[in-house]
């Protein structure tokens, strides 16, 4: 059975990376590492947090249709390399993407069965506090991120699920509950299809036997 594609998204500063790390500790998922043209932040490692590349390299991959999705956010390009995701899904592995909102909506258009989970801050004032205390952005960039966040929050209804990241452990538990529910739903669908196929095969065998008895041959 082909794997499921889960997409975590939300405003910058909402805590996607922290929630994602906790989720990956507690369940089996293939985590797809994104590519970006922004410079690494202190402590970030190339090939672990992101693949850090220059703009010409990124744009060359765009021309080769090498991204499942890509978008520009606050002056930098972000994208999900297509090949690793496709390989993992084909192996039957469930895949997790942690990407920007624009990219998540692109994925939903390209892969309608993808499950989009929007991570929401408890309030915009709390989001601003987190961005300020993170200490990574200038006041101008923080304001730009907040304006972007307002638009994203207004469009949260476009996503399959919304998780409020107020208390970290509660947000992680909610995220894991969504994964469990979706996996069970997929399992039930697979079982239902298998049962339907078995019924069809049994009916075909029964009809063949009736025809054989009636006409001394088969129905084929």
Swiss-Prot record:
E.C. number(s) listed in UniProt: 2.7.4.8
Keyword Lipid biosynthesis: no
SUPFAM superfamilies, A to Z: P-loop containing nucleoside triphosphate hydrolases
Alphabetical list of Gene3D superfamilies matching this protein: Guanylate Kinase phosphate binding domain, P-loop containing nucleotide triphosphate hydrolases
Reaction equations catalysed: GMP + ATP = GDP + ADP
Subcellular location: Cytoplasm
HAMAP family, A to Z: Guanylate_kinase (MF_00328)
Protein name: Guanylate kinase
